[in-house]
Amino acid sequence: MRLLTCDCTFMGQKHSGSVSVEKKNQENDGPPTYEIVFGWSQSFENLMKHRAGQKYFAEFLKGEYSDENILFWQACEELKREKNAEKIEEKARIIYEDFISILSPKEVSLDSRVREIVNTNMGRPSASTFDEAQNQIYTLMQRDSYPRFLASNIYKTVMGTFGIKEEAV
């Protein structure tokens, strides 16, 4: 059994979480239950630990022209699960080209301090090369996009499949 972990900072406080692969797969099989979907409104962490939550959130972000944020976050999670050193280096370079490079159409918005850390880390890519950048993007999505997602038609429609009206959400 492997653990998937995310260590992020939000409003100056450390956020840590881990989910076993077996449990995660059980939670993600089939359509989400009411409890799972309602849980998405209780915390961003709940939303992000479910494949369906990420799917609906990505759909929302695509409509806001900011889906590069979740795509980057997901790519970083995949990189952290990789154990083969050669594949880690290859995946890190792809992530850099796709999301960090100023030439990329999917460039994520990072402050100069974090961008410099990533550039330094790319000298010797590892599974943690993008940790600072991933934390910054996670926080950005949590503060900025997540509240709008909860008020979006996408989330209201998903809740509506359980007979829940807008007022209750």
Curated annotation (Swiss-Prot):
Name assigned to this protein: Regulator of G-protein signaling rgs-2
A single MF term (Gene Ontology): GTPase activator activity
Alphabetical list of Pfam families matching this protein: RGS
Mutant lacking the gene: phenotype: RNAi-mediated knockdown in ASH sensory neurons results in hypersensitivity to dilute quinine.
Function: Weakly inhibits G protein signaling in nervous system, interacting preferentially with the G(O) subfamily member goa-1. In vitro, it acts as a GTPase activator of goa-1. Rgs-1 and rgs-2 redundantly adjust signaling when worms are fed to allow rapid induction of egg-laying behavior. Modulates chemotaxis responses by regulating negatively the sensitivity to quinine in ASH sensory neurons.
PROSITE patterns: RGS
Originating species: Caenorhabditis elegans
InterPro entries: RGS, RGS_sf, RGS_subdom1/3, RGS_subdomain_2
Record domain RGS: where: 39-158
Tissue-specificity statement: Expressed in a subset of neurons including ventral cord and head- and tail-ganglia neurons. Also expressed in non-neuronal cells including pharyngeal and uterine muscles.
Entries under SMART domains matching the protein: RGS (SM00315)
Keywords, comma-separated and alphabetical: Phosphoprotein, Signal transduction inhibitor
The UniProt record lists the keyword Phosphoprotein: yes
